[in-house]
Amino acid sequence: MSFLRITPSTHSSVSSGLLRLSIFLLLSFPDSNGKAIWTAHLNITFQVGNEITSELGESGVFGNHSPLERVSGVVALPEGWNQNACHPLTNFSRPKQADSWLALIERGGCTFTHKINVAAEKGANGVIIYNYQGTGSKVFPMSHQGTENIVAVMISNLKGMEILHSIQKGVYVTVIIEVGRMHMQWVSHYIMYLFTFLAATIAYFYLDCVWRLTPRVPNSFTRRRSQIKTDVKKAIDQLQLRVLKEGDEELDLNEDNCVVCFDTYKPQDVVRILTCKHFFHKACIDPWLLAHRTCPMCKCDILKT
């Protein structure tokens, strides 16, 4: 049996061909409709007695259905241990003398629409929702139909936890939310997938050439890494798959998105259910698990369950 021999010249030829193919496919796709994303400038003031410190940053994004307006007020937390404000009778620990206040709510547990409505019914002038634990500085524009009369922005988990812990320590926190810059999403998902495939293919041929031309000495570390990769693939294959269909609650536009790609779930989407019961698009989570082995939300290791 003879195998194709990959040489640097072959690699260059293949890469050039792939580039021409990508340009052809790029020009073949119909124009995608641009979708505006508005950032939010947050002027945050921390007051302890007579000591006041402030910080200003473009640290949030407006929700897709939020009015683009300036709003300000003292920050109030949901009462009780749970900070997601999913219970319809949730109260907020706001100062009585405050004329205007903003609800700080944790993402998760229910839809964005429900959280915002709970805060609005309690008299909030705006809602700040901070992302899941473990998402670091990631934010995205929320979908919350039916709440178009109240300003709603998302901030990162890191910034949300900073404000939360400050208030829990007795710090008086006020926030001014102002409209930031507009960004357009001109690139369609098809083109994103195309360039992802193109980059992965070129990287494969490049690394393959390097691998073939570099002397290799087998060692225990290499064998161990190969065994772990094999174990991860087996563990992934044993995880449950599910095809979403009309009527599933995950298809509600107000439900949480896939945290890997931030796309909403649609009928016929194939999702992978992890042992921790979190689920994601199969096409998104499989590469993630191969690289990280852990759930992107709770860090559950699929090899330890």
From Swiss-Prot:
<dbReference type="InterPro" id="IPR001841">
    <property type="entry name" value="Znf_RING"/>
</dbReference>
<keyword id="KW-1133">Transmembrane helix</keyword>
<keyword id="KW-0732">Signal</keyword>
<dbReference type="GO" id="GO:0006511">
    <property type="term" value="P:ubiquitin-dependent protein catabolic process"/>
</dbReference>
<keyword id="KW-0862">Zinc</keyword>
<keyword id="KW-0325">Glycoprotein</keyword>
<dbReference type="GO" id="GO:0061630">
    <property type="term" value="F:ubiquitin protein ligase activity"/>
</dbReference>
<keyword id="KW-0479">Metal-binding</keyword>
<dbReference type="GO" id="GO:0016020">
    <property type="term" value="C:membrane"/>
</dbReference>
<dbReference type="GO" id="GO:0005770">
    <property type="term" value="C:late endosome"/>
</dbReference>
<keyword id="KW-0863">Zinc-finger</keyword>
<dbReference type="GO" id="GO:0008270">
    <property type="term" value="F:zinc ion binding"/>
</dbReference>
<dbReference type="InterPro" id="IPR013083">
    <property type="entry name" value="Znf_RING/FYVE/PHD"/>
</dbReference>
<dbReference type="InterPro" id="IPR046450">
    <property type="entry name" value="PA_dom_sf"/>
</dbReference>
<dbReference type="GO" id="GO:0005737">
    <property type="term" value="C:cytoplasm"/>
</dbReference>
<feature type="transmembrane region" description="Helical">
    <location>
        <begin position="185"/>
        <end position="207"/>
    </location>
</feature>
<keyword id="KW-0812">Transmembrane</keyword>
<dbReference type="Pfam" id="PF13639">
    <property type="entry name" value="zf-RING_2"/>
</dbReference>
<dbReference type="InterPro" id="IPR003137">
    <property type="entry name" value="PA_domain"/>
</dbReference>
<feature type="signal peptide">
    <location>
        <begin position="1"/>
        <end position="34"/>
    </location>
</feature>
<dbReference type="GO" id="GO:0005794">
    <property type="term" value="C:Golgi apparatus"/>
</dbReference>
<protein>
    <recommendedName>
        <fullName>RING finger protein 148</fullName>
    </recommendedName>
</protein>
<feature type="zinc finger region" description="RING-type; atypical">
    <location>
        <begin position="258"/>
        <end position="299"/>
    </location>
</feature>
<feature type="glycosylation site" description="N-linked (GlcNAc...) asparagine">
    <location>
        <position position="43"/>
    </location>
</feature>
<keyword id="KW-0472">Membrane</keyword>
<dbReference type="GO" id="GO:0005783">
    <property type="term" value="C:endoplasmic reticulum"/>
</dbReference>
<dbReference type="Pfam" id="PF02225">
    <property type="entry name" value="PA"/>
</dbReference>
<feature type="domain" description="PA">
    <location>
        <begin position="65"/>
        <end position="167"/>
    </location>
</feature>
<dbReference type="InterPro" id="IPR051834">
    <property type="entry name" value="RING_finger_E3_ligase"/>
</dbReference>
